[in-house]
Regions:
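Alpha/beta catalytic barrel-like cores
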Residues: 1-84, 91, 100-102, 108, ...
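Short loop/turn motifs enriched for small/polar and acidic residues
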Residues: 30, 119-123, 160-162, 260-262
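Short, hinge-like loop/turn segments at secondary-structure boundaries
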Residues: 83-85, 208-209
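A non-catalytic, amphipathic alpha-helix used as a structural packing/dimerization or gating element
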Residues: 87-98, 140
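Acidic/histidine-rich catalytic cores of soluble enzymes
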Residues: 106, 125-238
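Aromatic- and glycine-enriched pocket-lining scaffold segments that form the walls
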Residues: 113-123, 127
Length: 353
């Protein structure tokens, strides 16, 4: 953890100095910054509690995306937006509404849209007696959150599903079917996290279906190891397939991309830099593919030639293009960036209490 918000901001600056391209900050509501002696509970958060984040973003010409935090709170011990306890459910509804207002504040202050993603950890460890009731309450809670006036051209509300989690082995309220149907019916955005599905399912296969029926979709890019473990994103086959699906379907302006991972066993800055650079590498790799040629081979049933081409392309010199992109962005192209992290660790991180 961090002793102060400034420590977090300093580390973000260090990471951003090593990652090429343009980025947005993705904040959780739990990162509110209070003045000395001040506190507001989750249902009473206001834009002013995020003013310092807006100042930080403005100085760096960045936007901010946002997430209500429906966990790590005494009122999230069991259920949140699907709670049978009406007092607790209304508390979390007010939190969601507060976050929409904060998201619009971000969009208006920073001059770019804010993507606000809703995910709740509600579910049952063992076989439930009522599957419909919690989902009906969740549906009503979302209806109430979305009932407040907000500018849908500035705030893009997303809904994220999950197959199961620790202590939710038997039933997750916000399942894929629930979230896809709710988003489609209510004109909000479906968000897919590639760690939130059964291990035999891949998000790369789901993107094309969603693009056919939605103007915009959203992704949390992570790396699941046997379950939703949120390992650091690697330049692996599935990340490349996800990037290819976005690029070859001409959907770069229709897919909101965020990374969602953390590994507390390694240096935080290294984790940020490795994971984000790998997602960028995957997008570059996809942009360099002869996508029309490959599609024509598939349509003409030339499967042998298609396989040969796909395999040969893995050895094409895409790393040269990556290094040029890094050079133009004034960041290290290869692993030499790690020396800067090591120096920062010695000069700054080790001196923190």
């Amino acid at each position: 953890g961090y002793a102060t918000p400034k420590e977090l901001m300093d580390d973000m600056d260090q990471a951003l100095s090593l990652i090429p391209g343009k980025h947005k900050i993705n904040l959780h509501a739990s990162y509110a910054i209070f003045e000395d002696g001040e506190f507001a509970d989750r249902d009473a958060l206001e834009p002013r509690h995020f003013r310092k984040w807006v100042e930080y973003a403005k100085e760096r010409n960045m936007g901010i995306d946002f997430n209500p935090t429906f966990f790590s709170h005494e009122k999230a011990a069991e259920f949140t937006l699907s709670s049978p306890d009406e007092e607790i459910r209304q508390f979390w509804i007010r939190h969601g509404q507060a976050c929409i207002r904060i998201s619009q504040y971000f969009a208006e202050e920073l001059g770019q849209s804010c993507v606000m993603n809703i995910w709740i950890p509600d579910g049952y460890k063992d076989i439930p007696a009522d599957r419909l009731g919690p989902r009906a309450r969740f549906k009503d809670s979302l209806d109430q959150i979305l009932s407040i006036p907000y500018d849908r051209s500035k705030v893009y509300v997303c809904l994220e599903s999950k197959v199961f989690g620790i202590s939710l082995e038997s039933y997750t309220v916000g399942s894929s079917e629930f979230c896809l149907n709710y988003a489609a019916k209510n004109g909000i955005i479906s968000l897919m996290d590639n760690g939130h599905y059964h291990p035999t399912e891949v998000v790369s296969d789901k993107i094309s279906s969603l693009l056919l029926f939605n103007e915009k979709i959203a992704l949390h890019v992570t790396r699941p190891v046997r379950w939703d473990s949120d390992h650091v994103v690697l330049f692996d086959d599935e990340i490349k397939e996800i990037a290819k699906e976005i690029v070859r379907n001409d959907a770069l302006d229709r897919v909101f991309l965020a990374t969602d991972y953390f590994d507390a066993s390694i240096n935080r800055i290294s984790a940020w830099v490795v994971g984000i650079r790998n997602l960028q590498k995957a997008l570059l790799f996809a942009l360099l593919q002869p996508n029309e040629t490959l599609k024509n081979l598939q349509d003409r049933s030339n499967y042998s030639e298609l396989m040969v081409m796909q395999e040969e392309l893995k050895f094409y010199p895409f790393a040269d293009v990556w290094k040029e992109f890094c050079r133009q962005s004034s960041v290290p192209g290869g692993s030499e960036w790690f020396e800067q992290v090591r120096a920062y660790e010695k000069a700054v991180l080790w001196k923190r209490k």
